[in-house]
Amino acid sequence: MSDPIDVAAETPGDGLPPLREVIATHGLDARRSLGQNFLFDLNLTGRIARAGGEIDQGTVIEIGPGPGGLTRALLGAGARRVIAIERDSRCRGVLAEIAAVWPGRLETIEGDALDIDVAALGEAPRRVIANLPYNVATPLLIGWLRHASAFERFVLMFQKEVVDRLAARPGTKDYGRLSVITQWLCEVRPLFDVNPRAFTPPPKVVSTVVRIDPRPQPLAPARMETLERVTAAAFGQRRKMLRASLKALGDAEGLCAAAGLDPTARAETIPVEGFAALARAVDAAGSV
């Protein structure tokens, strides 16, 4: 992964005003309550857009477009159709201006993405490409993963620590429930870091853009509901051995034996396939 990017140039190429001017004209001061941190650098947003792959097909879904920096980059990069979900009504005007420049290619939905069935929006293949509001980023991703087969790709910006957890390997401090569930369903590839100074206001942490590609099939057979319960039990007491942390699920040692796992192992050492085997054992035993 490259070092954090520290960029400030704004290079719009669509005839629309620079983002600083847009924000001033529309009174779009970033609001902490909405988790807003605006990206001004259109070179950077262009890089995010290009990571989406063949966006000239299907539908691109953007969450929290704000003043439209990434929206403009997506359309400029050839996105056939962009559906932008924005709960801040102040952004209505600027998004309408962008839509006028790209007629028929931008649809705006005013609302909370947590309440919207994103997996049913637009035509496949669906790609979610977004600088997510950090206060809802993880719940959004977990909700989408429950319908992972509806999506072709996610290109998302999170706090770096979240991406570290998404991509973590067994035996590392960042490995946990989020790592297991995400990697069971998807291939995870961190792309690049973004310096806080690229945002207004600058967040207190480095951000990371990550590409998440849903697998044609999960890494190993299991029911997601059971896998979620198993990982919740195991990582809820991550320093305990499995024979202790899994007691709430039934005969912990018997479940470990059925899954081919050492009952004295700890959750942080178990690979994704091991948790899938444990979920199958739980279902077979009728423990959940």
Swiss-Prot record:
Single GO MF annotation: 16S rRNA (adenine(1518)-N(6)/adenine(1519)-N(6))-dimethyltransferase activity
Pfam families in alphabetical order: RrnaAD
Keyword Repeat appears in the UniProt entry: no
GO cellular component term of the entry, any: cytosol
Predominant location category: cytoplasm
Catalytic activity from the UniProt record: adenosine(1518)/adenosine(1519) in 16S rRNA + 4 S-adenosyl-L-methionine = N(6)-dimethyladenosine(1518)/N(6)-dimethyladenosine(1519) in 16S rRNA + 4 S-adenosyl-L-homocysteine + 4 H(+)
Compartments, record wording: Cytoplasm
The protein's Enzyme Commission number: 2.1.1.182
Residues holding S-adenosyl-L-methionine: N37, L39, G64, E86, D112, N131
Highest rank taxon of the organism: Bacteria
Keywords: Cytoplasm, Methyltransferase, RNA-binding, rRNA processing, S-adenosyl-L-methionine, Transferase
Its job: Specifically dimethylates two adjacent adenosines (A1518 and A1519) in the loop of a conserved hairpin near the 3'-end of 16S rRNA in the 30S particle. May play a critical role in biogenesis of 30S subunits.
Similarity field: Belongs to the class I-like SAM-binding methyltransferase superfamily. rRNA adenine N(6)-methyltransferase family. RsmA subfamily.
Name this protein carries in UniProt: Ribosomal RNA small subunit methyltransferase A
Organism: Rhodospirillum rubrum (strain ATCC 11170 / ATH 1.1.1 / DSM 467 / LMG 4362 / NCIMB 8255 / S1)
Native organism taxonomy: Bacteria, Pseudomonadati, Pseudomonadota, Alphaproteobacteria, Rhodospirillales
Gene: rsmA
